[in-house]
């Protein structure tokens, strides 16, 4: 019975595959698929990966619908639901390779987010007075972090759990605390 339902679900995903193949953002979706496959240690074709993650990961579905950015995503969401507690603002520009770790109650409202971005649950990236953060490449943001305002998070940064970041952070930093403090820069511990 389970395998029968699985086959039915795969048939329902055919419109997703067609839209993926015709998407102007296909290269970004491919980067996302590669990152997810690497993290989950899954080796399949791109179409196989797409079917797998659309079937098993509502957070991936949310990212996929964000990448489609057309009317069809609303129709697809009627029968193949996205994660409704994971919000990506439609004006946020996100490069490829986004990976999520259970993004329950996570809001991404940045000006832009670079490649190979990782985000955990309960994270808020938001605006103050219309100014939104810019996030660099290879940035990891962990549980409960808050990043707000017109600030820049540099490349290769990690924002620790519960950190509240209201000031720009340079490249290659590890940041923790409320208010956020840099504890490592370029791999070297910083004494505050």
Predicted regions and their residues:
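Terminal amphipathic alpha-helical/low-complexity segments used for targeting or macromolecular assembly
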Residues: 1-83, 192
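Serine/threonine-rich low-complexity intrinsically disordered regions
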Residues: 1-2, 25, 45-48, 59, ...
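Structural signal for interior beta-strand "rungs" in well-ordered beta-sheet cores
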Residues: 81-176, 180-183
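Generic C-terminal helix-cap and adjacent flexible tail
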Residues: 185-192
